[in-house]
Amino acid sequence: ITLKNKKDMETPQTGYQVKTYNVPVKRYCQTLDLRDSPELIAEYRKRHSQAEVWPEILAGIHEVGILEMEIYILGTRLFMIVEAPVDFDWDTAMARLNTLPRQQEWEEYMSILQQAAPGMSSAEKWRPMERMFHLYNT
């Protein structure tokens, strides 16, 4: 299967492939709501497409140590999964990310589309979610 065909096969109904790493990882899950406007939601989707996302934003995410970041959407609700090495410190990484090129500009623009106040950093807008069930521990 070619990479293009794999992507074509990934849907909410068929599931999404997950990368594995040679190091232990931990996961952060967060949520945020978009403004209830079809036009703004379409713009948010467009800005996060591979063709539109700013390369400086992707570079910054990698630079602070994040291995993977996925954002899922249902209506106006966003759900983000972040995977990072077990020694990753969220607060330190987010403080550093906020100083990297174009990050503040990106956050300002995204805040127009999100239910968030202008000037808020990514770490301030996205709310951490508590894991309430874990199959491996049952």
List each model region and its residues.
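Short amphipathic alpha-helical segments
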Residues: 40-65
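Acidic, low-complexity proline/glycine-rich segments
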Residues: 10-25
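Short, well-ordered beta-strand segments in beta-rich or mixed alpha/beta enzyme
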Residues: 28-33, 67-100
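Short glycine-/aliphatic-rich beta-strand segments at the starts of folded cytosolic domains
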Residues: 25-43
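Eukaryote-biased recognition of C-terminal alpha-helical segments
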Residues: 127-133
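An amphipathic, aromatic/His-enriched active-site/gating alpha helix that lines ligand/cofactor pockets
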Residues: 64, 85-125
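N-terminal amphipathic/basic-hydrophobic helices that include classical n-h-c signal peptides
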Residues: 1-9
